[in-house]
C-alpha cells in the first residue's frame, strides 16, 4: 500500500467504497445518521492534515447539519456542491475541505471549499462551536479520551456482533 495525504484517488475506487460502506453501516446501526468530512491535505507540513499526516475520512454521528454549520462558521469560505468523485477535478493539487450531511457511498454529495492556505481542525471547530464548547475543539489540549474509549468499546462490541452474525 502507498502512503497518502488525501483520498482524491481513492474516492474513485470501488474497493475503497466496499470498506467504507461496511464501516458506515456499523456506525449508522450504532449511532444513527452520520456526516462525512475530510481535510484534504497535499503536504506533510500542512496544518490542514491536523498533525496526522495520513489520509483519513471522518464519519461522524451528529444530529445537526454539518454542512450548514460549516457554511455559517466562516462566511468568507467559498463552498460549492460536489460529489466525492469530483473532488480531484475541483481541487486539482490544492488542499480542500469536504463535508456532507448524508453518507451515500460513492454517490455521497456535499460541499467543498478549495483552500488558499492550510487550516487546522476546521470541522472540529465547527462541531465544538455548535455544541457550545468552542474552546474544546483542539484534540491536542482536549483529547476527550473518555468519549473515545467509550466509543471504541461500543464499536468493538458492535463489530464483533456483526461479524458473528455474518458467519
Protein language model regions, located:
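HIT superfamily nucleotide-processing domains
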Residues: 1-167
